[in-house]
């Protein structure tokens, strides 16, 4: 098959869970004999036609590596018309691009909690973020023929937000081997620690939606019970300076270690030195870092939330308190009984085998084939006319968004600075 992978961003601009899944899909689909082309936005000079990566020009969004673009290059448009299946991996600047240019079945995988990210990265209070996503999520997802949810709990979330396209559950997968059998397993000495400490590890972005601040507070409480507790943090992000200050404020400088970013093929080596994996995030869809830690034989201490509950069996492969405030007790329970923690880690390793990327790709290919059998080579009815009508509808949604966030006289000053007083138009779209 000629398969197009459409992503709003791609390596090297951004490396996150969605980008990693696109890379894994490409590698394994090509190993099966399929022809895969990645379509994304970015600096056109970074395109690598020989490797099957086509970037269309976009405007850089700050210094985070993301780009904004309203159309694909002529080359990308033409190539998309030649695809037999298009698989999209972002809600915005992905599905709508495929809908405009492709003439084949479109699949969309929902990798992100857009409701929580909208609340975290805009001045919107969470109820307002939820309200706008109840409009945008079904509208954009509705451009696809089938939606993939990486977990059952995320399928329910999509239904709750009004997505009505056929939704199938295909769990994200990983390359298990580097975690099951690390090439160069690390030891406590590589952290500068003695062998008798209990070492927790967190791997992920250092940003507000991951709730690393909350994790530090829970670790501080656990350290009062288990003084030999240590936490190694792998990753970078916009909250790093704030997190370092929080560590000092909590008097955790001696037991929290910021390890920065290590090459991905070395992550399994570092996990091999840890006793447990911890996260306080409630914004996950199907967390690859949790699955990787399980494959490395680590028990999980995490907050019960969508995505997490589909990976971790509480009391078997780790502990999942229903509230973040109970995470310290989960950590203490693991540290106080190392033998039980090791047994849970072995159970986690066994459970991780169902997340093999080969299984994920096989199920996805079955989905592609079923769509091709029932909806081959679709000629979409006047896609540009439908696009124009949809943009008019989206302009109305933006006006609703403006009504939601425009501050009152007693409103939030932060929102007032972000949104011009006396207008209901989106920034850059005020009436002339």
Where in this protein do the model-derived segments appear?
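A short helix/loop element that forms part of the nucleotide-sugar donor recognition site in Leloir-type
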Residues: 73-75, 180-193
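Aromatic "clamp/platform" in nucleotide-sugar-dependent glycosyltransferases that forms part
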Residues: 91, 282
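Membrane-proximal helix-turn-helix segments that form the acceptor-binding/catalytic region
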Residues: 114, 129-146
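Carbohydrate-associated surface elements
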Residues: 153, 173
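Conserved donor-binding/catalytic core segment of Leloir-type glycosyltransferases
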Residues: 194-219
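Nucleotide-activated donor-binding/catalytic signature segment of Leloir-type glycosyltransferases, i.e.
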Residues: 244-262
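Short hydrophobic beta-strand element within catalytic cores of glycosyltransferases
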Residues: 299-302
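Conserved acidic donor-binding segment of nucleotide-sugar-dependent glycosyltransferases
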Residues: 314-325, 333-338
